[in-house]
A protein has these predicted regions:
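Arginine residue identity/basic-tract feature
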Residues: 6-9, 35, 50, 81, ...
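Residue-level signal for functionally critical sites in structured catalytic/ligand-binding pockets
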Residues: 27-29, 51-54, 80
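Ligand-binding pocket segment of bilobal, Venus flytrap-like solute-binding proteins
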Residues: 1-45
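Periplasmic-binding protein-like
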Residues: 5, 36-64, 68, 95-99
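Solvent-exposed loop/turn segments at secondary-structure junctions
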Residues: 28-31, 48-49, 61-62, 88-89
Length: 142
């Protein structure tokens, strides 16, 4: 069966319904299904990618002050605990220590910068017909 889920959550749901033997997904998805009691084994590889979830405030927002306050709140210990409870790795060191059992530390967290930046990664992996992942995807679905 060939499927192309549109999101991490959709991929998780398809996996739990029997599509595939292994799911490569985001850490928060693994924690979500573990916390739901689904029969899965969550593996943190020794070398993996750091995926950041940025927030932005529009410079011309009519609610710029409130938006900035909300953005600032996201990094408070209170908000970081909420993020951690939802399965997202906290960036606050104190909160990270509180949730250390949930968020194992891999030997190496690669960043896009480690791989030459988005322009290089996008070309090498996703460029139509020549990117490594594009070719694998085309072979699997073509």
């Amino acid at each position: 069966m060939k499927i192309q889920p549109k999101s991490g959550r959709e991929a998780t749901e398809a996996f739990l319904q029997g599509a595939g033997d292994v799911l490569l997904s985001y850490e928060n998805e693994a924690l979500f299904i573990e916390r739901q009691g689904d029969p899965v084994e969550h593996v943190t590889p020794p070398h993996t990618f750091k995926i950041e979830n940025p927030a932005a405030v529009l410079t011309k927002s009519e609610n710029a002050e409130k938006a900035k306050a909300f953005n600032d709140f996201l990094y408070t210990p209170q908000a970081q605990r909420l993020w951690a409870e939802a399965g997202f790795r906290p960036v606050d060191a104190t909160v990270a220590a509180e949730f250390s059992a949930d968020f194992l530390q891999p030997e190496k967290l690669w960043t896009i910068a480690d791989l030459g930046g988005w322009k290089q990664v996008d070309s090498a992996l996703f460029a139509k017909d020549v990117g490594s992942i594009a070719k694998i995807y085309d072979a699997a679905t073509g």
